[in-house]
């Protein structure tokens, strides 16, 4: 064996990166960049609307070069889907946990209202995007989002149905569910923590209004 070959064998020689998935640090950087793009899209869609925002603006806001942007996202519609999916799945997970909890229907409704107030206060931008631009999704994505939204509403409906059957509530009509969700969803329009509005106080007021009208 020559001296060069021996040295190469001893030191392991020049290493080559195996093909396939990138190293963890590179993959982590890619995930962080994608999150930055999504966060920028949330801010811009909420401020300017989905149709009023260009992909180039999102890239500039996220500090991502135009050539690299499409490595992380396929389209502006994909960003809209990701924003609305995340928010709605979060709402569904919380609603399902409350619906299946060992609580009576009155306490479940109280918990649902409180939880919904909290997530809307935390995700006002996503809610505004859903209300204003949700119908910009079409085809499969629109259908998938509607399934998630229907599941959230079904959780509320089950709580009211159980309460009505147990004699706790005066009504379990679907219009009541729509009214409750509408009341809470519109929070994004006027909630301003800088004015002293608190999530706890708003949730308490909403619960009082709902239960005063529903509880026998």
Model-derived segments and their meaning:
Residues 1-32:
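N-terminal intrinsically disordered/low-complexity leader segments
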Residues 3-4, 170-189, 201-213:
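Hydrophobic alpha-helical segments that form the core
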Residues 33-36, 40-78, 82:
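Helix-turn-helix
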Residues 50-51, 165, 169:
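Conserved hydrophobic residue
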Residues 73, 131-137:
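Short helix-capping/turn signature of helix-turn-helix
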């Amino acid at each position: 064996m020559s001296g060069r070959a021996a040295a190469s064998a001893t030191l392991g020689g020049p290493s080559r990166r195996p093909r396939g998935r990138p190293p963890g640090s590179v993959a982590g950087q890619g995930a962080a960049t994608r999150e930055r793009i999504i966060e920028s899209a949330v801010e811009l869609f909420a401020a300017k609307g989905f149709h009023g925002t260009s992909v180039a603006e999102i890239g500039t806001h996220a500090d991502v070069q135009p050539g690299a942007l499409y490595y992380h996202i396929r389209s502006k519609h994909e960003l809209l889907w990701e924003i609305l999916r995340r928010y709605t799945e979060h709402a569904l997970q919380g609603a399902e946990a409350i619906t299946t909890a060992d609580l009576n229907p009155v306490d479940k409704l109280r918990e649902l209202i409180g939880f919904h107030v909290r997530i809307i206060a935390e995700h006002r931008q996503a809610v505004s995007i859903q209300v204003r631009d949700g119908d910009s999704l079409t085809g499969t994505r629109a259908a998938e989002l509607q399934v998630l939204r229907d599941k959230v509403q079904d959780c509320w409906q089950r709580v009211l149905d159980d309460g009505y059957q147990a004699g706790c509530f005066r009504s379990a009509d679907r219009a009541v569910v729509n009214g409750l969700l509408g009341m809470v969803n519109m929070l994004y329009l006027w909630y301003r923590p800088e004015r002293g509005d608190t999530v706890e106080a708003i949730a308490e007021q909403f619960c009082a209004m709902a239960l005063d009208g529903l509880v026998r």
